[in-house]
Structures are given as structure tokens and as C-alpha cells.
Amino acid sequence: MFGADKGTADKLDGKKLHIGIVQARFNENITNTLAAACRAELLRLGVQEKHIRHVLVPGALEVPVALQALAERDEYDALIALGCIIRGETYHFELVANESGAGVTRLALDYQVPIANAIITTENLDQALARQTEKGVDAARVAVEMANLLEELS
């Protein structure tokens, strides 16, 4: 929802955090902007450049596999999934959107690591372009907030 009230978070301090980013290359013009906005926001929140691991995969269905590999290393306080799925003329859109989303959620629960899911799903390119920067920033903020929350709860 564009312009939705996302509330205010108190603990957006990333100074001590290690963050892993997995970016799908499919629709690369969009995902590159997502990644740039995400990285810039992580740095603004205090995450050190050397504590950000950024890997690329072919598409959204491969994102969970790379997230799992990072989660298994147990080196990251939070992970971020970046991708862009634009509806086409076939059922493939639903398949990719549902399976990638379910995979990301399952990994977060199985590994007890926060994963900010910014695999955006849109009806068309214009919607993707309108969301690419904001969703990258949101993903960084979610990752930092949830990493801090889980640290507080442990």
C-alpha cells in the first residue's frame, strides 16, 4: 500500500549488526535499485560496509536457497531478500510469488533469523518502478529492527 502508515520504530541502530542480502537478478533494473536503496539505508543506520554480505542469484525462486546457505553459517543477525516479480500472461507469476514467499518465511522460522522480504510482486512495470526505492529502504529498516528485537528477546 503506497503511503501506508508504517509506524515508528525506536531501535534502528545497526552498528553491531551483520546483515546478509540476497538479490535476484531477474528484472535487474528494478532489483539493482532495490539493492542500492537497501544498502544505503543499512549504512545510514550504522551497519558497517564490511558487515554486509551481498550475493546475487538468477531469480526469485533461487533466493531462498542462498538465504538458507547464509542462515546456516550463523554469522548474520538478519537477512534480506530482494527481487521483483511482475505479472505476465501465465500462471507462472503466482507460482514464483507464492513459492519464493513461502520459502523465505519458512527459513526465517526454521533458522530463527529475521528475514526482511522485499521480493516485490506487481501487476506491471510501472508499479515496480514506483516501489523500488521505498521497498529497499523498508527492507533495511525491517532487518535492523527485527535483529535488535530478537537480540532483546533472547
Curated annotation (Swiss-Prot):
One GO BP: riboflavin biosynthetic process
Pathway connected to this protein: Cofactor biosynthesis; riboflavin biosynthesis; riboflavin from 2-hydroxy-3-oxobutyl phosphate and 5-amino-6-(D-ribitylamino)uracil: step 1/2
Key word Transferase present: yes
Recorded catalytic activity of this chain's protein: (2S)-2-hydroxy-3-oxobutyl phosphate + 5-amino-6-(D-ribitylamino)uracil = 6,7-dimethyl-8-(1-D-ribityl)lumazine + phosphate + 2 H2O + H(+)
One Gene Ontology term of the molecular function aspect: 6,7-dimethyl-8-ribityllumazine synthase activity
Database matches in CDD domains: Lumazine_synthase-I
Positions of 5-amino-6-(D-ribitylamino)uracil binding: 26, 60-62, 84-86, 117
Matching InterPro entries: LS, LS/RS, LS/RS_sf
Known EC number: 2.5.1.78
Record gene name: ribH
Stretch forming the signal peptide: none
Keyword Transit peptide: no
CC per GO annotation: cytosol; riboflavin synthase complex
Residues binding (2S)-2-hydroxy-3-oxobutyl phosphate: 89-90, 131
Function per UniProt: Catalyzes the formation of 6,7-dimethyl-8-ribityllumazine by condensation of 5-amino-6-(D-ribitylamino)uracil with 3,4-dihydroxy-2-butanone 4-phosphate. This is the penultimate step in the biosynthesis of riboflavin.
NCBIfam families: lumazine-synth (TIGR00114)
Protein name, as recorded: 6,7-dimethyl-8-ribityllumazine synthase
Family assignment from sequence similarity: Belongs to the DMRL synthase family.
Entry keywords, A to Z: Riboflavin biosynthesis, Transferase
The organism's taxonomic lineage, starting at the top: Bacteria, Pseudomonadati, Pseudomonadota, Betaproteobacteria, Burkholderiales
Active site, renumbered: 92
